[in-house]
């Protein structure tokens, strides 16, 4: 539709002091934005759930809640509404694609509960968003569905994707400093995935 979608992980939201140092801020584990054509501030449409934007002297001014929470996160709804951020289980953004006039996006599940194995990848969520309307409308980028149990990969397939003319989407990640690749059966991220793997002789195939 001519717009650019941005996703962010572990970002600071809040106020900046006159000397450009960071003031009181929150640290949402993921957030999203749409950039419309142009180079003005109003072309950056932040799809953020702000705690409050009315009183600069009150707590949590322009601080933001995490866009999409992991279902295993343990903070209460009351604490989330107050502006606290999950630190135990979270999602980090993967890549996204357009299918059937909707945006499909992969979110990587991260377990941050083991001090001996922090930031452990343990699965993937497939989320689908509406593209009806225009940025700023309630319908645009509305979350239509999410499959928190899409897969249980410990690798971040789909950190980067390539939509090929052959009808597949190729999903890339790294493992032990080597590239790992999967691909979808169709241009639908929800279609069957297959993996480029080697046999005992080192010959790669799907």
Where are these regions (language model features)?
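Hydrophobic core register within WD40 beta-propeller blades
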Residues: 96, 159-161
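Beta-rich carbohydrate-recognition and catalytic domains
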Residues: 2-89, 98-152, 164-206
């Amino acid at each position: 539709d001519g717009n650019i979608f941005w996703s962010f992980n572990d970002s600071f939201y809040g106020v900046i002091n006159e000397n450009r140092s960071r003031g009181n801020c929150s640290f949402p584990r993921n957030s999203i934005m749409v950039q419309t054509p142009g180079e003005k501030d109003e072309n950056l449409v932040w799809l953020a759930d702000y705690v409050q934007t009315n009183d600069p002297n009150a707590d949590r001014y322009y601080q933001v809640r995490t866009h999409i929470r992991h279902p295993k996160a343990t903070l209460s709804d009351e604490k989330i509404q107050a502006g606290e951020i999950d630190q135990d289980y979270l999602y980090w953004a993967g890549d996204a694609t357009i299918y059937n006039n909707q945006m499909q996006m992969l979110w990587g599940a991260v377990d941050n509960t083991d001090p001996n194995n922090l930031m452990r990848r343990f699965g993937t969520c497939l989320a689908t968003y509406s593209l009806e309307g225009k940025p700023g409308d309630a319908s645009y980028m509305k979350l239509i569905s999410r499959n928190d149990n899409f897969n249980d990969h410990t690798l971040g397939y789909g950190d980067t994707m390539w939509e090929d003319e052959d009808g597949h989407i190729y999903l890339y990640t790294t493992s032990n400093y080597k590239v790992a690749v999967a691909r979808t059966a169709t241009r639908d991220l929800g279609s069957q995935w297959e993996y480029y793997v080697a046999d005992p002789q080192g010959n790669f195939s799907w």
